[in-house]
Amino acid sequence: MPLFDGKTLTGWEQHSGTAEYRVQDGAVVGKTVAGTGNSFLCTAKKYSDFILELDFKVDPSMNSGIQFRSNYYTQETEVEIAGKKKKFPADRVHGYQFEIDPSPRAYTGGVYDEGRRGWLFDLKNNEVARKAFKQGEWNNARIECRGSSIKTFLNGVAAADLTDELTKEGVIALQVHGIGKKTEAVGKEVMWKNIRIQELK
């Protein structure tokens, strides 16, 4: 089932930051702006068990990601995560992220816990997946969530494979990473298209 109609952002809503999102040539385009933290274009609906696939293209100087089973609170909320108390500002998106990392580190396809625990599965021991990323081209992302099992694939190559119990449901979201004080990074773009999901019973 398509999550994006290729023409409008119907069914999506922006949270956390003020990066610019628009539709162009059948793709969602996210553009960096100054003075904001990470921004997320989120589905209005939450998903639990699913197979998500999409194509993405990213400026080589950027960092981005695809959130899944992610959430946010309407007001400041304190919760306990891994035995530690953590305070979330209102509207701060947090949760699992399929990393998009065009840097030489090449962790695209790894799973990062945005706003919570950090890296859950990096790619330092998966050289095949690190080499699967195509710089400056469209890449295919696939995310499979079944219960506590999370698997990711980059251009058909197995990337991350982990078991995690923390969150079983949440939104899908497209991240434009904040750029801090890097004025030279203003106006950089990341694109996503052919966004589709198969919900699993």
Question: Where are each of the predicted segments found?
Answer:
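Carbohydrate-interacting regions of secretory-pathway proteins
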Residues: 1-201
